Amino acid sequence: MNGYVPYVIEQSGLSERSYDIYSRLLKDRIVFLGAAIDDQIANSIVAQLLFLEAENPKKDIYLYINSPGGSTSAGFAIYDTMQFVKPSIHTICTGMAASFAAILLLAGTKGKRFALPNSEIMIHQPSGGAQGQASDLAITAKRILGIREKLVTVTSERTGQSPEKVAKDMDRDYFMSAEEALEYGIVDQIITSV
């Protein structure tokens, strides 16, 4: 969300109010993930989800995603919050949902996960690097394998694909069109309008 942020001006009666576009979207219960997932982005998304739940726990939330993915720990903070809050969460891929962003796309409420027609979705196994003594490398490798297993389990449970198929598909970058993501079970529908 770095760079230029547009502002909108709303008029009511004799007064005007200026909002940055993200704050204005939040008024309509729309959250936009449009960057790589790091701790700062995750904390912002989590805060917005918690705010919207506190404001009205019975009203749906809309999470629009256009992201290359990012940190698994930051991603799981968003994922767990999505499962924790009471409102149904519609997920909508606009552009790309890659890596952990694809996990967030499939984390939406079943029946309410969408992709726009030209969206691209990509799943893969986690990656990481380490240096140091052999014992340090073993600890890091064990952690990454554990994260991989969690990602396989979540993807399998939420798509209906077997864990074996998901593990095989995640072995390398596995790109899907919107139609392929629909067949895979990552999204429930391809949409062209609201």
UniProtKB/Swiss-Prot annotation:
Pfam families, sorted = CLP_protease (PF00574)
Q: What is its main location?
A: cytoplasm
This protein's GO CC annotations:
cytoplasm; endopeptidase Clp complex
- As recorded in UniProt, its EC number(s) are 3.4.21.92
Any one GO BP annotation for this protein: protein quality control for misfolded or incompletely synthesized proteins
UniProt GO MF annotations: ATP-dependent peptidase activity; ATPase binding; serine-type endopeptidase activity
UniProt-annotated location(s) = Cytoplasm
Catalytic activity as recorded in UniProt: Hydrolysis of proteins to small peptides in the presence of ATP and magnesium. alpha-casein is the usual test substrate. In the absence of ATP, only oligopeptides shorter than five residues are hydrolyzed (such as succinyl-Leu-Tyr-|-NHMec, and Leu-Tyr-Leu-|-Tyr-Trp, in which cleavage of the -Tyr-|-Leu- and -Tyr-|-Trp bonds also occurs)
The active site consists of 99 (nucleophile), 124
Q: Which UniProt keywords apply?
A: Cytoplasm, Hydrolase, Protease, Serine protease
Taxonomic superkingdom: Bacteria
Matching SUPFAM superfamilies: ClpP/crotonase
For whether the record's keyword set contains Protease, the answer is yes
- Family the entry assigns: Belongs to the peptidase S14 family.
So what does this one do? Cleaves peptides in various proteins in a process that requires ATP hydrolysis. Has a chymotrypsin-like activity. Plays a major role in the degradation of misfolded proteins.
Q: Quote the PANTHER family the UniProt record gives.
A: ATP-DEPENDENT CLP PROTEASE PROTEOLYTIC SUBUNIT
- How does this protein assemble? Fourteen ClpP subunits assemble into 2 heptameric rings which stack back to back to give a disk-like structure with a central cavity, resembling the structure of eukaryotic proteasomes.
Would you tell me the protein name for this molecule?
Answer: ATP-dependent Clp protease proteolytic subunit 2
Q: Which organism is it from?
A: Halalkalibacterium halodurans (strain ATCC BAA-125 / DSM 18197 / FERM 7344 / JCM 9153 / C-125) (Bacillus halodurans)
